């Protein structure tokens, strides 16, 4: 696993890490692919004269999330139903818990390319309600290649959430990511992805027409990244998304703009992130309102601190000699304003995640 060793020779490890952080922040990059990229970084640091070989590791994780508005109750506490205003039922504060594991197996194909296969399973439970309880099986295949100053990353993925109280769905997709180093401090990145989601219309939910939400999503973005002082990164990105659905009132198009700041600290990596997006829906949903077209303006703010637990609590080195326990704190605020009452909401979520990595083969 020494895929980005060429880039490491060109620059410092800190700047390399900042460049990779831009890929880790990309919402089109799957969790499995993010884990894979981070493993590449670790192995580069550990190998002075790397040789092509197989690698395998197992991640076991636990996450707890505090949700201020888990059911997305509107700001007014009301909603539209057939042009009338009604009370918005639902739960606000609640906690969710996620326990899971993922296994990654891969091989360095050459001094500048590698491939990996990932499979994961997680179980999600809720403290008070049940709407968000599920188990999730997923998998992905990632291929990485360095060509000159380009870091190319195509991937395919599949997920199958098994919902407790709502229709199950299957999602499969493909994506492509490239980061190009202009010089020591400047780089550009671009990516595109496609996914298709299909809901399971069973006898139990046949009356609800859940397959009306079946959809295909196309997205693309381009970004610019500037690093300075070896430990700072400013990133910006413009994206465009088009969602096609079986029923056009579930379909939309919309642009978004993201700006972020990343800094490497002694106790972890700090990320500050802000995204502005506007989604315009193709048709009115007459069950909701016959004369109002839906348009959503969404602002998402995020603060995240992640790293090895030994960076945060040094005395844990006695129990984690290899530095294979990772932590992640994340605070997310989603402020949605919409032309429809039920889609205007404020959500604030705080999560803590612990990951233990077991090296199976290296």
Report residues per predicted region:
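Gram-negative and organellar
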Residues: 2-362
